[in-house]
Structures are given as structure tokens and as C-alpha cells.
Amino acid sequence: MLFRSVITQNVDNLHERAGSTSVLHLHGELTKARSELYQDIIVPMPNQGLQPDSRCEKGSLLRPHIVWFGETVPFMSTAQNYMAHADICIVIGTSLQVYPAAGLLNHLKPQIPVWVIDPHLPQSNLPMGYQWIQSKAAEGMGKLREQLLSDAYIHFK
């Protein structure tokens, strides 16, 4: 079974707008609201935004579906599971300084290939054997694509 997923700390919906269909938003989503009492109740953000008295169907107040500083990241165990079962890992545009997300690389199996795409090499949390592509995201993804296609060609030649 081939499983592809994006784990992001971004709260926008740019991954979905770019066509990604399996996106785990660690820090929530600006386009959604959730119940203050029932974390499993997540609804689209009303067009007019949340009003001070906006409530879910169970009557509790709604709030932005965002993880504020100091709050627990609700999907952390799911993200750890994704990492534990990954065949490859591509880290794009992060300093790897924000926890607990920065610790996700610790859940990879030791032999998993890891690429880091960023103009500046993160100073910590890099697994052994990682490959660094010193570029911004779009350019770096192009370089990674070329590298993978070249490696596949050499492997199957």
C-alpha cells in the first residue's frame, strides 16, 4: 500500500489548494472552528467568522481550530505514527526548533532516507545520513525530483 501524507505546522490551507489530499495540520487550521469542550467537533469556519456566542451543535462555544502556544498538540500521536511507518521523509522549510514537532524525526526508523530542503541548515535534530538541499522550497523540490529520477535511472539501468 502506498501512503503519502503531509505533516505541516502551517495553519493555512495551501497544501490542500496545491492538491495534497492527506494533510495532517499539527497546529490546526484557520479555515475551521472547533468546540471548546468536544475536540472531535470541528466545523468549517463561518464566512463571517466566529461571533462571541458561536456554538456547536452540542451547545459549547466554538473557537478557532488553532493550537495556541502552551496547548497540547492534539494530533501528535497520529504524526508520530505516520513517521514510524514512513518509507522516506522530506523536511521542508523549518528550523526544527519548535517542539514537539521538531521531535518527530526521532520516530523514523533508522534506515529511512531523509532530505532537508532549506536555505539554512537546521542546527539540531537531524538524523544520521540526512541529505541537505540548500534551497528554498520550490527550487529544492525541483532539485530533489531530479536527484531521485537520476538515482532511479542509475538503479534500474
Can you annotate each of these PLM segments?
Residues 1-157:
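Conserved catalytic alpha/beta core of Sir2/sirtuin-type deacylases, generalized to analogous enzyme cores
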